[in-house]
């Protein structure tokens, strides 16, 4: 994290959400412009997805399962362990956010696609379809 400090503008701050209760973490995510993903060997990296759906640019590691949804401009992948490139991509993301990235049509379209594929409504539809298939099997 100390690598990042030289690139961090004075009006920006880093707020760790590790070990926070879910409601507090959700509150932080809803007000965040950038989320740093430190997913390592996770099956499906849920925190980066939650951050992207919340409207933040996500920069960092994909873990294993998050590769399928790490797409620019909303999510910017970094090779696991590449601290220098991680820092540079975060610095680029800060500049992009300051230049208005979060308000661009492309960013909003990317967010909408994530919500459509991974949001609660789709999850509910898939669960209902699963229950119907199970019921039909008996």
Regions found by a protein language model. Name each.
Residues 1-23:
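Conserved catalytic-core segment of nucleotide-activated headgroup transferases in glycan assembly
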Residues 27-32:
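Short alpha-helical donor nucleotide-sugar binding micro-motif in glycosyltransferases
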Residues 98-135:
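A charged, aromatic-enriched C-terminal amphipathic alpha-helix characteristic of glycosyltransferases
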């Amino acid at each position: 994290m100390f690598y990042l400090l030289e690139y961090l503008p004075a009006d920006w701050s880093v707020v760790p959400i590790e070990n926070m209760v879910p409601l507090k973490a959700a509150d932080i995510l809803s007000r965040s412009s950038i989320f740093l993903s430190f997913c390592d060997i996770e099956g499906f990296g849920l925190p980066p997805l939650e951050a992207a759906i919340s409207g933040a640019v996500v920069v960092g590691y994909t873990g294993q399962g998050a590769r399928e949804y790490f797409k620019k401009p909303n999510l910017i992948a970094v090779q696991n362990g590449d601290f220098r490139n991680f820092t540079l991509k975060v610095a680029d993301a800060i500049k992009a956010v300051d230049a208005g990235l979060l308000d661009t049509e492309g960013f909003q379209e990317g967010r909408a696609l994530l919500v459509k594929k991974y949001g609660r409504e789709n999850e509910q539809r898939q669960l209902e379809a699963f229950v119907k298939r199970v019921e039909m099997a008996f």
